[in-house]
Amino acid sequence: MCQLKSCLVLKDRVFCPDYNSHQQMLEELGIEDDYLHASKTFVRVEFTPPDNTKSLIEPLDRWTLEVDQDIVPEWWDKKADRQRVEEAVEIWRKRHVFTGGKHIVTTGTVYAYGDAEVHAYNDATVAAYDSTIVKAYGNAKVYAFGKTTVETVSNVPVEAYGDATVKAYGNTKVEAFDRAIVKAYSNAKVEANGSATVKAFNSATVKAHGNAKVEAFDIAIVKAFDIATVKAYNRAMVIYPEERKIIYPAGWTIETHE
């Protein structure tokens, strides 16, 4: 299964790394994944919160412990070993689950709730909920839910849901759903779905679906589908593929757009 949060229970400790792949855990520890070792050395477990990642801050006694293998060693005691798993996951949670304060992450996956503020760099991934603030740079990835506010620079991909607000710069790619609000600048690319609202500036590119609303400025380009609404200003261009129609900016000529 390898769900969050996966651990490997050994007789003398619980291995609970940043990742959730049991196979990767066994390889890191140099343990063969075979019947002999499964019956004597390790137990794969999944320790999951009641509502997946939305409830990572719930008390650990509400989480569910599942064994992810058919045979277990004789020393395995689900009640006693659950306590060991809880202790290991609590240590992991303190490092990866934020409910307040300002945090800087450069690698791995973290989860932000409440009024936490996260600055993500390099290959870090942030899943943000509630009213959290995320500023992402480099190759970081952001998944925004609730009323999260995200500011992205460079190649950061963002998926925005609920009432999330995103400001995207550089070559950022944004997928917006529900009532998410996006402001896109530079060469940012946005796909807007549901009732998402987008304001596109500079050379931003937008694909709008459903009831999405887009305001396009400068030389932004918008492709509009379904009943999406677009207001275009300056030299922005709107393309309606389903209607085979293009609305050119005022003063547009072949010479000025070659």
What is the role of each PLM region?
Residues 1-258:
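Short, glycine-biased loop/turn motifs at secondary-structure junctions and
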